[in-house]
Amino acid sequence: MSCAGAAAAPRLWRLRPGARRSLSAYGRRTSVRFRSSGMTLDNISRAAVDRIIRVDHAGEYGANRIYAGQMAVLGRTSVGPVIQKMWDQEKDHLKKFNELMVTFRVRPTVLMPLWNVLGFALGAGTALLGKEGAMACTVAVEESIAHHYNNQIRTLMEEDPEKYEELLQLIKKFRDEELEHHDIGLDHDAELAPAYAVLKSIIQAGCRVAIYLSERL
């Protein structure tokens, strides 16, 4: 999972063939349900699915805590509604992974209490730097999550794209929404945050550690 250079900070949607910038984070939403999938407890690769669902659940939980911290500081400011809209989508992501945890009997990471505290602290701490700091955090985190989701998509495509079709569609949908949040952060002056390049690199290093640990613990 690489950290993109802050100087250029390209719009990540351009890296996706056929991506359409006009689909905003507040636009049309696609419902994904596990109704006709070939995925069952008997025919899936339990190790792969457990790992994917556990880490994604942890990531969406952490993202929710980050936005909660940002709203605690900036909720009454002009950027509050923007943050709230992104947070609402993250709540939907977390709800879906909560359902998948039950459906596929996946235990959560033992690090949930830690992500609870650190996520809120990261959100509130960067928000104390102002709108730009909060948006820099959003750009860093959402970029990391999008790269992580891309890695999972490659893994499932190599495993069995037909069997995991609906899980693939879900991850792709969430990946696209994270990229939209990334672009919203750039549109709201993330790059004007104090020491933007350093801040982004530190946050993304933390994301890589969190992903590594949540997959395994």
UniProtKB/Swiss-Prot annotation:
Record family assignment: Belongs to the COQ7 family.
Sequence repeats: 48-129, 130-217
UniProt topology in membrane: Peripheral membrane protein
Stretches the record annotates as Required for nuclear localization: 11-29
Name by which UniProt lists this protein: NADPH-dependent 3-demethoxyubiquinone 3-hydroxylase, mitochondrial
Chain positions recorded as NADH binding sites: R51, Y212, R216
Annotated source species: Homo sapiens (Human)
Record annotation: effect of changing R107W: In COQ10D8; uncertain significance
A Pfam family it matches: COQ7
Subcellular location: Mitochondrion inner membrane; Mitochondrion; Nucleus; Chromosome
One GO CC term on file: ubiquinone biosynthesis complex
UniProt keyword terms in alphabetical order: Chromosome, Disease variant, Iron, Membrane, Metal-binding, Mitochondrion, Mitochondrion inner membrane, Monooxygenase, Neurodegeneration, Neuropathy, Nucleus, Oxidoreductase, Primary mitochondrial disease, Repeat, Transit peptide, Ubiquinone biosynthesis
Subunit and interaction comment: Component of a multi-subunit COQ enzyme complex. Interacts with COQ8B and COQ6. Interacts with COQ9.
Keyword Cytoplasm: no
Region (2 X approximate tandem repeats): 48-217
CDD domains cross-referenced by the UniProt entry: DMQH
Cofactors named for this entry: Fe cation
